[in-house]
């Protein structure tokens, strides 16, 4: 569900069906293969114009969205401001860069006083852009967080699968200051740095996406919503600790027999972390905070391993279980040990909360694959 091969494009006939749900990543006619949306669950197509313009409505919250392929005569900013003028709403520029522009707007839409966010992202492969508008009525402003998440669901390139979305990048930008971090991994002291705002920015994303996740507590698509929750944290976290990940890899890889040996050093490191919850509303500790000695739980530790491995170009994912209230790290490896299959791959699983265990060893009572949900990563 999260690889290019599994990314799907809706046919025009399917898009005309109001019952059609947009799940996982979806792409568009007229844009490159790496341009996609990873929308929150239970958005469906209310109306469409051909295969390039769609009005979306959400089944679990009073939020609507428009996704439209647009030509870019000049910059994303110009295309976005032109769209706002046509919509006849008031707006203020929240931020722009060479790839995208973002505005916050308010005005009357469909006869209701409304508020929302709009962005245009540029597809470098075709020169076209995607206009993405997400809004709710002012009386439903408490759901505006879902509109933010819709904006952040847009990926304009393969690199965006590993980076903060447009909203987080432009509204919560990096600082100009970096802070030193140190970690003892595999007997070696790793010295690196992270942006000074990495922790606070990451925690904002985590808290927001947890609000999104709570919308699906009683939804039949709760598992898919859970998967997206972790995917959104993954893509944001990959960027926050990318330099640290690469410093770890390049300082350790020459001493490791293979990728599994490297991954074992990460697993042993996370097993020694202090246990703590409630770092954020969701109880998920941000990865930057963990580098400063903050406590963590199983899912944050599993995510830490997955992020470092993915940043090191090593195939990994995580498995989560509502039944066991637990999470496991997972690594694509031909080493012996207990593994779970996801898609067409077998993943060696790792227990992050019991010191001394190696990859492929978990509690016997937790080996039922049916009780685990895979979170596949790019």
Task: Indicate where each model-derived feature is located.
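Secondary-structure boundary elements
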Residues: 226-293, 353
